[in-house]
Amino acid sequence: MHLSPQEKDKLLIVTAALLAERRLNRGLRLNHPEAVAWLSFLVIEGARDGQSVAELMAEGSTWLRRDQVMDGVPELIPEVQIEAVFKDGTKLVTLHDPIR
């Protein structure tokens, strides 16, 4: 299997996001890398499912709450920027203050 650097990055995000999902399901609080991976994964999958950039940016602040992440993590993530493939091409999605 020959993967481009971008494809390797996406696989790493997916792997970390699946771990984050399992930890959330067990009631554990996410650390910084897990929270970023989870948010990034939801953007990538939302784009794949046909959601628009505007929809993802609006929903992005509802995916994680402060009580789902370790202390200090919300302050470490003032925004998340992720490139996602939409039906009309690759676009940059920015989530502002994604953990509220």
From Swiss-Prot:
Instruction: Name the enzyme's class.
Output: hydrolase
GO terms for MF: nickel cation binding; urease activity
| InterPro entries reported for this sequence | Urease_gamma (IPR012010), Urease_gamma/gamma-beta_su (IPR002026), Urease_gamma_sf (IPR036463), Urease_subunit (IPR050069)
UniProt EC number: 3.5.1.5
Pathway noted in the entry: Nitrogen metabolism; urea degradation; CO(2) and NH(3) from urea (urease route): step 1/1
What CDD domains does its record include? Answer: Urease_gamma (cd00390)
Q: Where in the cell is it found?
A: Cytoplasm
Database matches in SUPFAM superfamilies: Urease, gamma-subunit (SSF54111)
- What are the entry keywords? Cytoplasm, Hydrolase
Q: Indicate where this protein is primarily found.
A: cytoplasm
Sorted alphabetically, the Gene Ontology cellular component annotations on this record are: cytoplasm
The GO biological-process annotations, alphabetized, read as: urea catabolic process
Which reactions are catalysed by this chain? urea + 2 H2O + H(+) = hydrogencarbonate + 2 NH4(+)
- What quaternary arrangement does the UniProt entry report? Heterotrimer of UreA (gamma), UreB (beta) and UreC (alpha) subunits. Three heterotrimers associate to form the active enzyme.
Matching entries from NCBIfam families are given as: PRK13241.1 (NF009712), urease_gam (TIGR00193)
Task: Report the family membership.
Answer: Belongs to the urease gamma subunit family.
User: By what name is this protein known?
Assistant: Urease subunit gamma
**Source species of the chain:** Prochlorococcus marinus (strain MIT 9313)
Q: Which gene encodes it?
A: ureA
